[in-house]
């Protein structure tokens, strides 16, 4: 006999509350019931359909899924920690992330620190059992990494619109004492099917600062996005400046279709990063080249701040030139520094252009 969907609890969103469950879901993570069959080929994540399953498949999934208050958990998503979820009273789709309840404070602290922002994802509801924590997020429609992988290069006008949203999200985090540490393209996801609006997700691993000092000691970063100061022997580094470097890698990848630093051998890859050895692709406008160089500076103190990025001419909505001011940020935005190691990069890579994942 099918269970009757429970009514959604009244109250504001993004709140934590104790569950009233029909079944004990705290003993283990939800398990999806599957028919026994032979191995099935799996598509890579970028080729999976963005639209929801057809009605018959969804009905079958709901009938066999795990019940969680007014929600049912459906198929697990890539990585195993998140599940597709359906809010029964409204039929709205969500992504449910599951954590041990002991991690509740660490998981929710970054979201509690940040005021709501249109370009930063936050849980719409949090349910807590005795052993597991369930955070529900609005479903998204692909990410920037998949977009670059499928299109190779993003035209400058479109890239500027998307990158402004990315920089806005980072500036919001930095202004409220949050360092992302592991910033990369796949953390920026599309909130709409038209792929026009980006939001930053996965703040759970961010570092919440307790004061103005943003010094970090851990070496937490994706190899392709890691800053040279993290690879050095320095005891600490600026977390915010490291985020800006990673954002510069993301911008370069959007415009070029490949990472600025590439090598199959990690030692050689890290050597290129330490030297700042990259070559800008041909055809970029002068403002775009300027912004990339202002972000991928070997010295952290020479990079633009996240707020300063938004003042750069490449991201200005007004195409008319502005009168120069004495603002430090404006002066920094106007500087077009010579990239360190550019000649080395040209000698090493020549004219070849390696496409992402190709």
From Swiss-Prot:
GO molecular function: ATP binding; mitogen-activated protein kinase kinase binding; protein kinase binding; protein kinase inhibitor activity; protein serine/threonine kinase inhibitor activity; transcription corepressor activity; ubiquitin ligase activator activity; ubiquitin protein ligase binding
Keywords annotated in UniProt: Apoptosis, Nucleus, Phosphoprotein, Protein kinase inhibitor, Stress response, Transcription, Transcription regulation
GO annotations of cellular component type: cytosol; nucleoplasm; nucleus; plasma membrane
Known tissue expression: Highest expression in liver, pancreas, peripheral blood leukocytes and bone marrow. Also highly expressed in a number of primary lung, colon and breast tumors. Expressed in spleen, thymus, and prostate and is undetectable in other examined tissues, including testis, ovary, small intestine, colon, leukocyte, heart, brain, placenta, lung, skeletal muscle, and kidney.
Induction per the UniProt record: By hypoxia, TNF, and by nutrient starvation. Expression is PI 3-kinase and/or NF-kappa-B-dependent. Induced by ER stress via ATF4-DDIT3/CHOP pathway and can down-regulate its own induction by repression of ATF4-DDIT3/CHOP functions.
PROSITE patterns per the UniProt record, alphabetical: PROTEIN_KINASE_DOM
Stretches with biased composition (Pro residues): 41-54
Cellular localization per UniProt: Nucleus
Segments for region (Disordered): 1-54
Assigned protein family: Belongs to the protein kinase superfamily. CAMK Ser/Thr protein kinase family. Tribbles subfamily.
Comment on protein domains: The protein kinase domain is predicted to be catalytically inactive.
SUBUNIT field: Interacts with AKT1, AKT2, MAP2K1 and MAP2K7. Interacts with ATF4. Interacts with DDIT3/CHOP and inhibits its interaction with EP300/P300. Interacts with APOBEC3C. Interacts (via N-terminus) with APOBEC3A. Interacts with RELA.
Physiological role: Inactive protein kinase which acts as a regulator of the integrated stress response (ISR), a process for adaptation to various stress. Inhibits the transcriptional activity of DDIT3/CHOP and is involved in DDIT3/CHOP-dependent cell death during ER stress. May play a role in programmed neuronal cell death but does not appear to affect non-neuronal cells. Acts as a negative feedback regulator of the ATF4-dependent transcription during the ISR: while TRIB3 expression is promoted by ATF4, TRIB3 protein interacts with ATF4 and inhibits ATF4 transcription activity.
Protein name: Tribbles homolog 3
Native source species: Homo sapiens (Human)
Lineage: Eukaryota, Metazoa, Chordata, Craniata, Vertebrata
